[in-house]
Amino acid sequence: MTMASVPKPDPQEAAKYFQQKLDCTTGPIELSHWIEEKASVQVVDVRAADDFEKGHIPGAVNVPRDQWAGAKGLSRDKTNVIYCYSQTCHLAAAAAVEFSKKGFSCIELEGGFITWQRASLPVTQTAGKA
């Protein structure tokens, strides 16, 4: 029987990594509080338009991948909270990289839309759609 190799990261490197993660991500409960408190955030859904229409975080703007070049709907004055489908979807991270390079302040909603739903937080549909 062989023993599994368990990583043992350098504590200083781990501290840097986790601080950067905290600086660049948020969870659904924290985001819901920011929305309630009218904090300086713009929620950005990077899922496909038809999925956005079926349900999204209230107040979110939809910027699907084919619209990233223009970054229409993002805010230069607020922190843009980017989300996609789930924890395994990397669209939000890819969008955050692209938007950050364009000068937008961005963080990622960890777990995406599915985590928001599982927390029983409000979901809205686009008027006249879905």
Placement of each model-derived feature along the sequence:
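Flexible, polar/low-complexity N-terminal or interdomain linker segments that lie immediately upstream
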Residues: 1-42, 49-51, 125-130
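Short loop/helix-cap segments at secondary-structure boundaries that form the rim of catalytic
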Residues: 52-58, 71-75, 116
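Short beta-strand/turn micro-motifs composed of small residues
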Residues: 45-47, 84
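Short low-complexity, flexible loop/linker segments enriched in glycine and/or proline
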Residues: 119-125
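Catalytic cysteine-centered active loop of the rhodanese-like fold, especially the PTP/DSP P-loop
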Residues: 74-117
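Helix-loop module immediately N-terminal to the HCX5R catalytic loop
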Residues: 61-80
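Conserved beta-strand scaffold positions in the cores of enzyme catalytic domains, especially
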Residues: 43, 60-62, 106-108
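Short active-site oxyanion
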Residues: 38-43, 58-59, 79
